[in-house]
Amino acid sequence: MIPGTLLGMALMLGLGACGKPTEAEPIQLDGRVLATFFPLESMATAIAGDAVEVLCPLPEGADPQFHKPTRAELALYQRANLVLTNGAGFERWLASASLPPSRVVDTASNFTEPLIEHTGMTHSHGFEGDHSHAGTDGHYWLDPLLAREQARRCAETMSSAFPEHAAAFAAGLAQLEADLDGLHERFATAIPQGTRLIASHPAYDYLARRYGWEVHSLDLDPEAPLSEEQFAELERLNGSLEPALILWESEALPATRESLESRLDLRSVVFSPAENPSAAQRAQGATFPDILAANLKALEAALGEK
């Protein structure tokens, strides 16, 4: 048996050999700006130019509202100098994410107009599983004037984080504002007030409020056939509203489009929310204003053919 004094000395020596417990290493920031989805990535890229790298870790095909980032994606956010978010609780994962509040930017924080609320319903699209659209509608980036406010908030916080690039950011913002102002003028003049539309998804209410459209939103999956119940609801709306068109976030099934047109004289138009463009669109270099402009062109053309 080892005497108590010797045992104590042995333990002290053992602890000394192990060294003192070390504190967690501080996260080394990587000098990048991260955005939670494409519209903010596109805006920040337009503002930054070549001055700062902008990245969006959202995988292709994922819904930014309901996607749960992987550990690798979270690590990218944690190392970023700034994380640009849509705000209004749009990105559900942010409520439980461990990110420093000082580096997370709510790009809707300067809005003066009230946000739209939905009662919503639970449904499922693709691999994201069941989810609900109840609560605050976060699709305000589709309104060019609200998108402009988000862009200004991006530029403001980017200039604070990277003051050496403030002049470049101001120039980038000025061009982006001009693009968004031009889109606003085109929407205001090209689509008549009072235009009646059915929407396959509750994504267009800010546009409707801005430009005086009448939009009735459903929750239809463009990749799934219409059920008899859904078709009956569309038939009812078609008879009561006499809508011009039905808007889809992405291309509906050919059978769905043909059935709606032949049975209800209801034409389908793709009006992309630009949340997460395809790899092909990205390869073509499409920007957020580009996608909005393409949406407007498609809607205007379809209305002209009615």
Residue ranges of predicted features:
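Extracytoplasmic metal-acquisition and chelation regions
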Residues: 18-306
